[in-house]
Amino acid sequence: MDAGGEEEKQERHRVDGASPSMVALRSDVLHAVLGGKSHNQDTSELVTLSEWSKNKFPLYAYAAAFMFLVMQEYDKRSHGIDFLNRDFVVRDLGMPSLNKHFPVKEFYCSYRRKSGHSTYTYGFFMLQKLILIQNAHIRREEEEEGACSMVTTSHRTGHSRSVGLAARDDPTAEMRLVQGEGSVGTTSHRMGALLERWISREGRTDGGDTSVQGERSVGTTSHRMGALLDVGSAVDDPAKQRSAMGNSLPVESKFTDEKENDRIKYVVSSMQGWGEKMEDAHAAILNLDDTMTSFFGVYDGHGGAEVASYCAKRFHIELCNHEDYDSNLSNAMRSAFYSMDEDLQLSDAWRELVIPRNNGWMYFLKAAACTSICKATYTEPAYEGSTACVVVIRGNQLIVGHAGDSRCVLSRNGQASALSVDHKPDRDFACKKNERLPPEDQMLTCNPDILTMDITDDMEFLVIATEGLWCNMTNQNVVDHTHDRLLEGAEARVICEELVQFGLPSGDNTTVILVLFKPGAYPAVPPVDTDTDTDSHTGDDVDNNDPANEVDPTANAGSDDSNTSDEVKVDATATAVGSSSTTAVAADEATVVSLSTATITIVDNYFFINTSEEVDPTANAGSDDSNTGDEVKVDATASSGLSDWELIYSEF
């Protein structure tokens, strides 16, 4: 290299505060990354500071070039470019050459170890070590509180946003570090002791929580790993600094969606609030299987958003695929809970649905050949999971299933009715534990509570929400507010967003699904009436006490000309009449027939009664020509009565 080039390199060294070899490596890294292919370079001087990836890029290059980890605010078009088909955002990590070529909106960032996940902390050790080489600085108070944050491009406390924005135009401004108390400095020779202390903290037993809860600020809105730093003035409110989940300011932007058909209308709205990230997920499907079946579910994740997101994408599919979906929806729903839990425990394949292959820290670490880190991630007990509160509306039936503390509340003429009971450690879990087992051996179950009920005209709406709402409002408060606002003519969308806003003080994420039943769409279930039955053709009442209307129990239903194949189709809601001889009203013919010697056949949830001839209750129904091999036969005797009829129906 000529003398001019050598002088230029020395000048860059003086500007950047890095060694000449580091500057040269940066130039090589830049060309390698821009070229998008493997680049061989001499790393003999950095052999202890690098770990080669499968495509021969040193881990240092990845750490310096990419902001790995998924960010909720990330937009590739506005935040950065796509390097090597990886959706990582270019950030200011002490590489002015990259930032000069690829300016982005926000380039101040920090890396913070995820709370409660000490198993993969070592995966960030190498990155922290390499980033610290790039003139990083650690605050003493974070170190004392066990917050292993990796902060680059720090600024003085109280610096305004304008100071940070102005620094973008000056590539050297990012290298000007605050040499405050406890800082590392600009050279790497002081790093050894700090890194040793950092490593020693991996044996902590406090769950690995490294969140910064101090009252001082460095002029940033601190987020944990994977989020941006909002460079601005310090937050003066200690309560907000010590918020329940780590944010200095709540994220009050809401996601809202609504749809309707001729029977129901739903609105779903969600808000991150004070949560450090959004761990709620939901599913709202108006037509689940191209029928009048609707599905609604809210899922409140803990330990991360992955499980909740997986449930929102997969639960209703498991439900539809179950063999009992058509015949026994309650059983299918219970089985879906078990199936989801089994999928989550037996394999990590489900993560493919919620962690994009080209946009996540896991794939970044795999690309960097950190095999030991990846293995350690999944070998320890899982600390992530999700609640589930799901509602299925099929025809005139409402089925609710839930596990956890998400809740479903029904408004019936303005009165709140809880359709679920929260599962909390201080409630039914106390009854389920085995007192002879130590706490670490006590098991929790995914067995859900299932409720099935008929929809009636006095039902107004359902509110399905995560814990964020119910922490601040009672069931009746929610119903009163929604009911009053509907009477005022407020839009359902506005009402749902108001409910979400009520969950802000809880410090948790909040998701609300509001389901409105349209008037007249769900007729009330006819009450049991032993006096009269209405003829569906003439509208005349049939008095069962009138001797003229009595039916001979031994009479054949074949006398009805409209009865084909000697069968009468009976609706599932047909009412049994009498006690000594069981009778029923055919839904389409309103013909009273005898069940004393009849054989009931169930096909696709319809009841068929063969009364063309006397049938032995123990005989096979094969004598009925209309009976197919797929039909299920149920025998009824004269002593069945109303309760037996209901029992027969409930079993199918």
Curated annotation (Swiss-Prot):
Positions annotated to bind Mn(2+) 1: 300-301
Listed EC numbers: 3.1.3.16
CDD domains xref list: PP2Cc
Cofactor binding, note field: Binds 2 magnesium or manganese ions per subunit.
Disulfide bonds: none
GO biological process: signal transduction
Cofactors, names only: Mg(2+); Mn(2+)
Pfam families per record: PP2C (PF00481)
UniProt keyword Transcription regulation, yes or no: no
Name of the top EC class for this enzyme: hydrolase
UniProt catalytic activity: O-phospho-L-seryl-[protein] + H2O = L-seryl-[protein] + phosphate; O-phospho-L-threonyl-[protein] + H2O = L-threonyl-[protein] + phosphate
Positions with a binding annotation for Mn(2+) 2: 300, 467, 508
GO molecular function: metal ion binding; protein serine/threonine phosphatase activity
Location of the region described as Disordered in the Swiss-Prot/TrEMBL record: 524-567
Residue intervals of the PPM-type phosphatase domain: 265-517
InterPro entries recorded: PP2C, PP2C_BS, PPM-type-like_dom_sf, PPM-type_phosphatase-like_dom
UniProt entry keywords in alphabetical sequence: Hydrolase, Magnesium, Manganese, Metal-binding, Protein phosphatase
Family: Belongs to the PP2C family.
UniProt-listed PANTHER family: PROTEIN PHOSPHATASE 2C, PROTEIN PHOSPHATASE 2C 22-RELATED
Official protein name in the record: Probable protein phosphatase 2C 19
